[in-house]
Amino acid sequence: MKRILTFFLALTMVLSLAACGGKADDNKGKTEVTMTAQEIMDTLKEKLGDSFGCDVAETEDNISGYWGLDMGQVESWASMSNSNSAVNSSYAVIVKVKEGYAQDAAALLQTGYEQILSYSRMYNMDLQKVLQARLFVNGNYVALLILGAQGDWEASDEVQAKFAAEEAAKVDDVWRGIFGSVDNGITIPEEDGSNNGGFFDMTDDEGNNDPVLGG
């Protein structure tokens, strides 16, 4: 009888340990991210190297002005672009926001992205990279990432698109390394036929070729 009781006690302990081990395995890889937006930016810059593309830090006025974010809802932020933005559309905006503001922030970044895309389509400048933009929402972290090395502008659209996709995949890999998953929420609007999305009117009222901003 004692041997039977001892056997069942031992079996119970083994099952308990196995259950605990299973819970530990379930939690493995689910480390909570506590990085600031700047720390995430620094990680992207380090891991991507030449595929990062940004060399200028943006100001808070840019975050609240151009992107329209409510800074009262932002816990930390980081934003960078390329100093030659007329021909290099590399851009990275990362924010850690307060609870409940992530989707609003994502919508604002989407709106700003559409203006960048409109410019890129109008001049056919760095277009394939812009079309490979990433909009990530992971908990309270939101990011718009237009990153990648410059491709060969003289190459065919197909070759440029393939190169841009490969560069964007590098961004996915780094983001996945931080958050464990990637889910690109960017929306690519269709071209409206005007070639400029209403962002610029390239002729003045008299039909001259002098560019006029704002219509």
Can you describe what each PLM-predicted range is?
Residues 21-215:
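Mature, Sec-exported extracytoplasmic domains of Gram-positive
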